[in-house]
């Protein structure tokens, strides 16, 4: 069985940005923030205009031909996506999944919304 540190080692395979760097992108129309926390957490508050894509269903949103296929990714191949979760773990894995499934310009907020709250 994999250890937690092994699981999180994928952080070295993705692009991570700080909450401060993410804040600079908040009003950029070419950037879409994606909240991968559960629906309940999302409904309590999110970052700016972030859309909700539950981490547990992410592959179903990304895979072509799946019931939840999201045209946003297909129709906006040059858009930048900034992913976040609560503290960074789910965001890291979601960013890696998106990258592996062909999303080219995707970044993870290190420390998630918890770090974002510190700089608001």
Labelled PLM ranges:
Residues 1-31, 39-80, 89-120:
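Rhodanese-like catalytic fold shared by cysteine-dependent sulfurtransferases
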Residues 84:
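Short, surface-exposed ligand- or partner-binding patches at beta-edge/loop junctions that are enriched
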Residues 35:
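Conserved active-site aspartate in kinases
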């Amino acid at each position: 069985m994999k250890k937690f540190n092994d699981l999180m080692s994928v952080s070295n395979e993705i692009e991570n940005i700080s909450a401060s760097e993410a804040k600079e992108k908040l009003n950029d129309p070419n950037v879409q923030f994606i909240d991968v926390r559960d629906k309940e957490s999302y409904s309590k508050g999110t970052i700016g205009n972030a859309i909700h894509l539950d981490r547990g269903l992410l592959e179903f949103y990304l895979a072509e031909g799946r019931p939840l296929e999201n045209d946003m990714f297909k129709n906006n191949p040059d858009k930048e996506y900034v992913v976040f979760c609560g503290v960074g773990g789910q965001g890291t894995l979601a960013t890696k999944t998106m990258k592996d499934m062909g999303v080219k310009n995707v970044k993870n907020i290190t420390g998630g919304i918890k770090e974002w709250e510190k700089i608001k």
